[in-house]
Amino acid sequence: MAATQYYGTGRRKTSTARVFAKAGSGNIVVNQRPLDQYFGRETARMVVRQPLELVEMTDKLDIYVTVKGGGITGQAGAIRHGITRALMQLDEALRPSLRSAGFVTRDARKVERKKVGLRKARRKPQFSKR
């Protein structure tokens, strides 16, 4: 591997992404597939690119990602978090701008567990007066 490689681990919901960034031409590879091929929906692709567009490094870095667990939204969020951490490793001066955009903080929201006696996490069974 290259000597100038930067790493960041990103997490969101049940997804975990391992992100490797190095100098290049702007290729983003997710699980051995190009970004456009891996994510079918445009919003997920947009979420992944957000930190790179913010610091204007879209065509300066090659990003290699392995991501596990969760669905499309969770994986996209995990990749975004990982890219943000890799960028901060590359240049600590980028931290304030990334923080103000809200990319540094890990989104702690997870699926709430189903409770006994309820139909879902909070949905109660239908009540009948008579």
Curated annotation (Swiss-Prot):
Keywords: Ribonucleoprotein, Ribosomal protein. It holds the Pfam family Ribosomal_S9. One of its GO terms (molecular function) is structural constituent of ribosome. The keyword Ribosomal protein applies. InterPro entries: Ribosomal_Su5_D2-typ_SF (IPR020568), Ribosomal_uS9 (IPR000754), Ribosomal_uS9_bac/plastid (IPR023035), Ribosomal_uS9_CS (IPR020574), Ribsml_uS5_D2-typ_fold_subgr (IPR014721). GO terms for cellular component: cytosolic small ribosomal subunit. The gene is rpsI. This is Small ribosomal subunit protein uS9. One of its GO terms (biological process) is translation. It comes from the Bacteria. Belongs to the universal ribosomal protein uS9 family. HAMAP family: Ribosomal_uS9_B. It comes from Shewanella baltica (strain OS155 / ATCC BAA-1091). Transmembrane segments: none annotated.
